[in-house]
């Protein structure tokens, strides 16, 4: 079953056409990584998926429903979203940052929310004592883990990740990659992960999408990209 569908999407920023007649379907349980040249439309596609952008033409469907006919806030409650600049609230403890969305919607069971936050902290590799700290007291890698925990708080079936590990050092990045693979294996769901790092795309993705100038150049497994690159652009990309 396709949980994400972008159908005949056209999208521009001013005079610049970013996506043109763009089509993408993502099946339940897929870990899709998206990679390509700067400005090729990866982030735009991601923002269309959770309604941050509205296409000029075409349809975005989540779980079979055209999102233009749904409550956008309700849609986003069911989608985890992780970006490079995590956007934690500096005046809130880590626990309150993780619990922000359910508290925003005034969920009545505060004890269950707190227990869920502790569980997720453990899931992403954070010690329980860190929940009482503030973002400024954590390293970049730790803050990124908080961002992932916050995205998981509502048990979303879809997680969108836009270069989430781009601002951390190489050792931390590798640890976070292992964590997100483990989380995907444990919790299931569908992940769409934008990256500029081909090694990361090939390591994480069960399916890898290569884009250039608003078009899909190749869509396949990591092995297919490595063994049978569709174009010179893909060949240069996988060669590193």
Regions found by a protein language model. Give the residues of each.
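Conserved ABC ATPase "signature" region
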Residues: 110-129, 182
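Helix-to-loop junction immediately C-terminal to a conserved catalytic motif
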Residues: 50
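ABC ATPase NBD coupling module
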Residues: 66-80, 104, 110-114, 225-229
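ABC ATPase "signature
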Residues: 219-220, 228
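Conserved ABC ATPase signature
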Residues: 134-138, 142
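A short, proline-enriched helix->beta-strand linker immediately N-terminal to the Walker B motif
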Residues: 153-157
